[in-house]
Amino acid sequence: MEKQNIIEMEGVITESLPNAMFRVHLDNGFDVLAHISGKIRRNYIRILPGDRVKIEMTPYDLTKGRITYRLRKR
């Protein structure tokens, strides 16, 4: 798959929803519904409210995204 039309943004998890879905507040002020990518799910990386994450979104639907990375806390 080509990644030429992917939009990558950072945000903070605000709410944990059923079926591994999360509500994410992006740095630009928008809220997005996001699910976990396969690599995060396979490696059992725990994502909790308050964590900073990187999200990939498609330009066709800017209300949904995929969590690709959990940023480390300082």
From Swiss-Prot:
Residues 1-72 form the S1-like domain. One of its GO terms (molecular function) is ribosome binding. It holds the Pfam family eIF-1a. InterPro entries: NA-bd_OB-fold, RNA-binding_domain_S1_IF1, S1_domain, TIF_IF1. The keyword Plastid applies. Keywords: Chloroplast, Initiation factor, Plastid, Protein biosynthesis, RNA-binding, rRNA-binding. SMART domains: S1. One of its GO terms (cellular component) is chloroplast. Coiled coil: none annotated. The keyword Isomerase does not apply. It is found in: Plastid, Chloroplast. NCBIfam families: infA (TIGR00008). PANTHER family: TRANSLATION INITIATION FACTOR IF-1, CHLOROPLASTIC (PTHR33370:SF1). Component of the 30S ribosomal translation pre-initiation complex which assembles on the 30S ribosome in the order IF-2 and IF-3, IF-1 and N-formylmethionyl-tRNA(fMet); mRNA recruitment can occur at any time during PIC assembly. Belongs to the IF-1 family. One of the essential components for the initiation of protein synthesis. Stabilizes the binding of IF-2 and IF-3 on the 30S subunit to which N-formylmethionyl-tRNA(fMet) subsequently binds. Helps modulate mRNA selection, yielding the 30S pre-initiation complex (PIC). Upon addition of the 50S ribosomal subunit IF-1, IF-2 and IF-3 are released leaving the mature 70S translation initiation complex. This is Translation initiation factor IF-1, chloroplastic. The lineage of its organism: Eukaryota, Viridiplantae, Streptophyta, Chlorokybophyceae, Chlorokybales. The gene is infA.
